[in-house]
């Protein structure tokens, strides 16, 4: 299959591109480089041993998207593109709604014009909001607490409405929305990984930059939660397991018309301090940290129930916490080397 990956040089998309190519598919990457760098496509090519097609473009450019879909004879789309920082979304809601919601509408308009009706959407556990029970399954109420989560939920609602329509000559939409939890780690090559610009928003990149000496210490937001060690618990999933989940969803699409939602997570939560200790073991470096006050809106625990993905996609996570941390550390060391060359 020919697969268009929007946001194709981003963190999760770049790892998915490798999994898809190695499974025999052909990927086309489409990105405006707001959250990534053009050289990621070159690193993907280095891992694969052959070049990949990478196109610069904005999701709101419907005409260009249509041309890309048609000229590359795209069979299915995996939609990763979008702004993604929770805190930033509260400060810049107009930019988030424009890039994320308008961008998705533009994509679906282009897909309709090009008669491409298979879509995997990159959603988020942020749509659930504060957990009302654990583990969180797909039937959990969706009450997002920030503009980013509301973006994702609105897009899902839009996709569900579109999935109830028919395309040209009665074609049926086949759409899967993957709600994933906290992706971490990197490809085993050390050539690609999570590469945040500025201060990292996510725990592991922050810890990695403390370990490498780029940041002095980690701030742990609260140690008085009702958890085993008092720090927040989250479901961390290796990015390569997540990438394989997208491949499984792609294979699920042809036999399943309509709109389907699935969680992708490990089903196990780790606390902030457990992650710090695991990273210390993986890196051999001591991680300096300071406990500070809780952040407004933070929750004690959040982890997934992914039984639906196991039953319908025949997918489950394979990689351990140690592998998550070891690969993230290898990538951080590689980043330091690449930036000095």
Language-model region placement:
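Short, flexible, glycine-rich and Lys/Arg-enriched loop motifs at helix boundaries
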Residues: 38, 181-202, 212-234
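Glycine-rich, flexible loop segments associated with nucleotide phosphate handling
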Residues: 54, 171-175, 197-203, 231-236, ...
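Short-chain dehydrogenase/reductase
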Residues: 97, 145-153, 193, 197-201, ...
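C-terminal substrate-binding subdomain of Rossmann-fold SDR/epimerase-dehydratase oxidoreductases
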Residues: 206-341
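Conserved alpha-helical elements of sugar-nucleotide-dependent glycosyltransferases
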Residues: 12, 203, 271
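Pocket-edge positions in alpha/beta enzyme catalytic cores
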Residues: 57, 69, 96, 139, ...
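N-terminal Rossmann-like NAD(P)+-binding domain of SDR-like oxidoreductases, especially those catalyzing
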Residues: 1-186
